């Protein structure tokens, strides 16, 4: 149950917060308050200033203007340690557990306990205390297991326990359900409700608006680095929140574009990969977006990586323009006009410490070589700038380090990288994961533009409205099998789900 009668005095209040980076204003007079035992949603498009504001609160950045109050007492947060001493913890979207440490070692990392005159690590105490802490949120695990051997949902629980172990009074959760299953999300929500009942404040950042109505009490909205307003969840609607976030109504959230279909550009026949992909056959045509739906673990990504040559097929055939092709590596796939955009853009799609421009031109450097194999920088820069403009990548310049861009702009840069090589077949895995509603629409428009040029797109997505909204045709996978095919006209969420569980036990 959501808390309705919030106490009058906020635990945290941020007033008039402003922040500048190299003369560019990232936050402009932002307000935020949160009460004990409340879940406050912090909403805004990518680039709205949410991360910057939370980094100020958690001590990663210092504010340039404004005041922060904890229990009505003015505080000056100058570092992460100071924030933690004030009871503020943050659980980042990219979880921070050290994979080669055990669970109990991760929980006590930085606050290890020692015993005896020789100051020896008190492992027994840390083990037993870790087990007690885990039990407080109804979670059991072998605390001697290495972090690399547990799943994302379990990692999330350990991160929460780390925050609790530090006696946190306020926990910031940044996109906590991005990689969670439905069952893991439900478990997380139970834990959040338990924390609420103990008077702990939660600031909850998510692009999944349905979750806001499930778990949050109030919503604080930012846009373009400015405070837009706050509203109680019970007094608002999804459409109202979208309007607050983007400053306009998204009447057409999924801008479908009808394009005349051409011949099959790609066909696969009885394609298999180990026990993950089982005798799959389909084709995708020029001017078509083929949606690929299914539950997590259904084999969609494995199918994509097998076509792209990242995984070696066990059996079956791949045809491009009716010609049988043997693809044994991504390099061969690219040479045959196939591009693949991974679901994990930060690990597999980008080199985070490189510039936007270098990331975009990375797969196409040969194009800029002159007769002595030297890169023509002027030609490269011009084309990079053209693609930045064409895809509306919001960046101060092509020289900006790409990790500083919002998720939506990073994704557009990856798309620019791949369409720069002029592929005929684009496989895109979870194209809008972790991207705000405004940037999603921009991505859909880019995909529509690509298909209108006579290219074929295979779009893997776990976002059901997205699959229904922009696909021309939908294939559904279940347990490695192709369980169903639906035309745009006949497809519904119910039909997709029926096929998605067709091969489940």
Swiss-Prot record:
SUPFAM superfamilies: P-loop containing nucleoside triphosphate hydrolases. It comes from the Bacteria. GO terms for molecular function: ABC-type D-ribose transporter activity; ATP binding; ATP hydrolysis activity. Its EC number is 7.5.2.7. Residues 12-249, 259-504 form the ABC transporter domain. The keyword Nucleotide-binding applies. GO terms for cellular component: plasma membrane. CDD domains: ABC_Carb_Monos_I, ABC_Carb_Monos_II. Disulfide bonds: none annotated. Keywords: ATP-binding, Cell membrane, Membrane, Nucleotide-binding, Repeat, Sugar transport, Translocase, Transport. ATP binds at residues 44-51. Belongs to the ABC transporter superfamily. Ribose importer (TC 3.A.1.2.1) family. The complex is composed of an ATP-binding protein (RbsA), two transmembrane proteins (RbsC) and a solute-binding protein (RbsB). This is Ribose import ATP-binding protein RbsA. It comes from Clostridium tetani (strain Massachusetts / E88). The gene is rbsA.
